[in-house]
């Protein structure tokens, strides 16, 4: 009784005022039943006290026996106290073990975090190695292309050497034929012949310079075409890689969603178990000795629920930030390319509808321009065929790397030999120029007079003038035809250049789109990492809750053991009451002790009143704690429901945007970056529509002007 009184007094000191607690009595029916039970117990105790007053009159004779028995009971109580102290020591040891185990758990968590960081570092190094391998493969492909170019240049140089040799031989034969005089003319003078020869030489040099310039322009255009093909190859490979990355990202996102669903289900199951355990704790409050421990457990659970509340609030804030960031991205896209004020959902939907209407009008305009674009599409089809062939060659080139390395040395030797041949050709060109100078010197009349004589000089001059006039007319006609052909080639190459420039502008737009897609994918990777971190935190929380459940179960078993001990004590009290009934037979001896017994009974009544008051205060305190826990659970549920509502709003917004863009929502799970990509395409098409129309108009006007130029040249 003394231990119970002290515990009740301690609980009463920490309990709140009765004015605050009586308001909640109507809400908790269990406490009313307990109060009725305690009142019935008090009434029974009072009736028993009245009976004992009558019995004490007959129990004075057996007081000495009772005192002896009380001494024995005091000895047993001291033994029980010693056992209680031993139990307290064991509890202290177990608490120290629990603290050490918690420290070990924290160390293990730190080790797991270190392992996760090491795994992330290894993954980063693996990605870097993969990127290096890809760059090396690109370098190998470029070296193969350079080898092919070198081999082609060597073959072209050989062909040019053979052609130059043939031309040189033909020129020598033509000069020999020209030097043979066939016809005569008496009108031309020596000075006229010299002037005509000089004019012919100047015209030949001018035409040669034009031919060299045209050949250089042709080579430059060919190199640009090759570079554009190489860029197309690289862009196609990058597109394939990025498509694979996008597929992997979608798969990982689905896995993360599944993990989140499983974590939410586990959390709900844990909440159910926590509720069941709270009900068990409420049932275990009938034991007075375990009330302090239950209150401490409730405080711990409330602190942990506050932590979970904070975590759920953080999750809600993250979901809100994701929703606002997604909406702000769309608003920023529409702001950057269109004049837009505000970033609400209604304004965004209105802008998207306006863009759809504009696109419909643009489609009508495009249907009119498709006839003009068909010619350009044919050229693009040819380039796509070249592109496919180049892809096949690239696949074959990876297998032929080892063989090409052996051929590299051979081709380098051939390059050296080609350089030697170029030097020889330059030397032969110099000889050829010297030979022409010598011919011009030999065409003088003094040398011809010295060789053939003075009499044959006029005949030789007339014959040469006639031959030179014929050759001059033939050369002029040939030069005109060559110049006309070169001008045609220049015009065709200019048209090709314009088409290639348009193609290059389209490719640059594609590159910009790909860069934006990369940025979106990096954002997705960051979101995936954040989701991984949240999942890990949830797993840690689940583990902690499971540990706490285990501890609560252990405490429940301990409480059951204590209940068994209390039952044993009740049995002992029943035995004592039987002994008291036996002692009541000796009432006559205890008449002298009535007054003392009455005083003791009054003190017992006061103690009972105090115990009842303390029990009420403890019950009210427990009710307050339960109400706090229930309010926290309600706030948690409300926050979760708000998060679910916001997720539904996000999903509805995505569905509306995707339906307006014409995407299939029901077939497959659409990622956010595809919707953003479609919006960016709409904005790009809105910006570049007028530019493309202007370019097409320029092309059509150029095509209308070119045939007029051809007619002028023919005239």
UniProtKB/Swiss-Prot annotation:
<keyword id="KW-0175">Coiled coil</keyword>
<comment type="function">
    <text>Plays a role in Golgi-associated microtubules organization and stabilization.</text>
</comment>
<feature type="coiled-coil region">
    <location>
        <begin position="478"/>
        <end position="656"/>
    </location>
</feature>
<dbReference type="GO" id="GO:0000226">
    <property type="term" value="P:microtubule cytoskeleton organization"/>
</dbReference>
<feature type="coiled-coil region">
    <location>
        <begin position="30"/>
        <end position="286"/>
    </location>
</feature>
<dbReference type="InterPro" id="IPR039139">
    <property type="entry name" value="CCDC170-like"/>
</dbReference>
<feature type="region of interest" description="Required for binding to microtubules and Golgi apparatus location">
    <location>
        <begin position="355"/>
        <end position="591"/>
    </location>
</feature>
<dbReference type="GO" id="GO:0005794">
    <property type="term" value="C:Golgi apparatus"/>
</dbReference>
<feature type="coiled-coil region">
    <location>
        <begin position="360"/>
        <end position="418"/>
    </location>
</feature>
<dbReference type="GO" id="GO:0030054">
    <property type="term" value="C:cell junction"/>
</dbReference>
<keyword id="KW-0333">Golgi apparatus</keyword>
<comment type="subunit">
    <text>Binds Golgi-associated microtubules.</text>
</comment>
<dbReference type="GO" id="GO:0036064">
    <property type="term" value="C:ciliary basal body"/>
</dbReference>
<protein>
    <recommendedName>
        <fullName>Coiled-coil domain-containing protein 170</fullName>
    </recommendedName>
</protein>
<dbReference type="GO" id="GO:0008017">
    <property type="term" value="F:microtubule binding"/>
</dbReference>
């Amino acid at each position: 009784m003394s231990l119970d009184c002290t515990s009740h007094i301690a609980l009463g000191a920490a309990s709140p005022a009765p004015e605050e607690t009586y308001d909640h009595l109507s809400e908790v029916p269990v406490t009313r039943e307990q109060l009725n039970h305690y009142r019935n117990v008090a009434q029974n105790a009072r009736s028993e006290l009245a009976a004992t007053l009558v019995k004490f009159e007959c129990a004075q004779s057996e007081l000495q026996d009772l005192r002896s028995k009380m001494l024995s009971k005091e000895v047993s109580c001291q033994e029980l106290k010693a056992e209680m102290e031993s139990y307290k020591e064991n509890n202290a040891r177990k608490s120290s073990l629990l603290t050490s185990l918690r420290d070990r758990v924290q160390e293990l968590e730190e080790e797991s975090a270190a392992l996760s960081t090491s795994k992330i570092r290894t993954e980063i190094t693996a990605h870097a190695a993969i990127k290096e391998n890809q760059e090396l493969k690109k370098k190998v492909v470029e070296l193969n292309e350079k080898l092919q170019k070198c081999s082609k240049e060597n073959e072209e140089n050989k062909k040019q050497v053979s052609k130059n040799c043939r031309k040189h031989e033909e020129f020598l034969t033509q000069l020999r034929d020209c030097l043979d005089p066939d016809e005569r003319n008496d009108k031309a003078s020596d000075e006229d012949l010299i002037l005509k020869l000089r004019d012919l030489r100047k015209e030949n040099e001018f035409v040669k310079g034009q031919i060299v310039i045209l050949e250089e322009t042709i080579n430059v255009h060919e190199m640009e075409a090759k570079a554009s093909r190489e860029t197309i190859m690289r862009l196609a490979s990058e597109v394939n890689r990025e498509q694979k990355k996008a597929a992997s990202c979608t798969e990982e996102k689905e896995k993360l969603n599944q993990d989140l669903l499983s974590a939410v289900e586990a959390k709900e199951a844990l909440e159910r178990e926590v509720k069941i355990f709270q009900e068990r704790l409420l049932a275990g409050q009938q034991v007075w000795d375990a009330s302090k421990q239950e209150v401490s457990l409730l405080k711990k659970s409330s602190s942990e629920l506050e932590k979970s509340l904070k975590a759920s609030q953080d999750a809600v804030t993250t979901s809100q930030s994701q929703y606002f960031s997604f909406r702000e991205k769309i608003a920023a896209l529409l702001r950057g390319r269109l004049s837009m004020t505000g970033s609400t959902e209604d304004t965004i939907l209105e802008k998207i509808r306006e863009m759809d209407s504009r696109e419909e009008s643009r489609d009508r305009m495009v249907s009119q321009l498709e006839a003009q674009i068909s010619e350009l599409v044919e050229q693009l089809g040819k380039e796509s065929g070249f592109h496919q062939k180049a892809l096949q060659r690239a696949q074959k080139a990876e297998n032929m790397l080892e063989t090409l390395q052996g051929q590299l040395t051979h081709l380098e030797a051939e390059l050296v030999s080609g350089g030697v041949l170029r030097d020889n050709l330059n030397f032969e060109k110099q000889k050829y120029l010297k030979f022409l100078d010598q011919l011009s010197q030999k065409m003088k009349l003094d040398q011809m007079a010295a060789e053939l004589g003075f009499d044959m000089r006029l005949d030789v001059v007339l014959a040469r003038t006639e031959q030179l006039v014929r050759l001059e007319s033939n050369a002029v006609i040939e030069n005109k035809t060559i110049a006309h052909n070169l001008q045609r080639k220049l015009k065709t190459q200019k048209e090709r250049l314009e088409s290639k420039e348009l193609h290059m502008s389209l490719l640059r737009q594609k590159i910009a789109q790909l860069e934006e897609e990369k940025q979106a994918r990096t954002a997705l990777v960051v979101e995936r990492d954040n989701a991984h971190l949240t999942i890990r935190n949830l797993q840690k929380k689940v583990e902690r809750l499971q540990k706490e459940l285990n501890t609560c179960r252990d405490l429940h078993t301990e409480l059951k053991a204590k209940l068994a001990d209390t039952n044993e004590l009740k049995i002992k009290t029943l035995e004592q009451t039987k002994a008291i009934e036996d002692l009541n037979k000796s009432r006559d001896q205890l008449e002298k002790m009535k007054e003392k017994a009455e005083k003791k009974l009054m003190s017992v009544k006061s103690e009972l009143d105090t115990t009842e008051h303390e029990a009420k205060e403890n019950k009210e305190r427990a009710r307050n704690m339960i109400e706090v826990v229930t309010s926290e659970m309600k706030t948690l549920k409300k926050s979760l429901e708000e998060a679910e509502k916001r997720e539904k709003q996000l999903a509805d917004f995505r569905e509306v945007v995707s339906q307006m863009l014409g995407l299939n929502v029901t077939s497959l799970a659409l990622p956010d970056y595809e919707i953003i990509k479609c919006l960016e395409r709409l904005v790009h098409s809105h910006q570049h529509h007028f530019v493309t129309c202007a370019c097409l108009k320029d092309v059509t006007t150029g095509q209308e002007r070119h045939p007029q130029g051809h007619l002028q040249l023919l005239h």
